[in-house]
Amino acid sequence: WSAVGGLTRNPHDLTRSACGSSSGSGAAVAAFLTPLAIGTETDGSIVCPAGINGVVGFKPTVGLVSRTHIVPISSSQDTAGPMTLTVADAAAVLTIIAGTDRADRATAMAREVQQDYV
């Protein structure tokens, strides 16, 4: 929601919600305004907008992607993840954003499991 533009709508049906706190990201990808977006999720904020807007989005395992500068809600659930038009693009984005961050202790083991997800 924005004070300027109001409620984010599903670009496929403007009478419907875009779903969740990362709805702007999902709607922007679905409307071809951007080829990718990064959503943040505690419980459904990536996967709901992805599903409702017809794009690819998933919640990576906590600790695989840094949470630095993400507003904390739940340290055991918060993470960031990709929203794209294709599975291959989502895998490529995850390959780029996954890794260790000294500012986020949860990512200490990320390099050990990190791989090329494409």
Summary of predicted features, one role per range:
Residues 1-80:
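Short glycine/serine-rich loop/turn segments
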Residues 59-118:
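A short helix-breaking turn/cap at a secondary-structure junction
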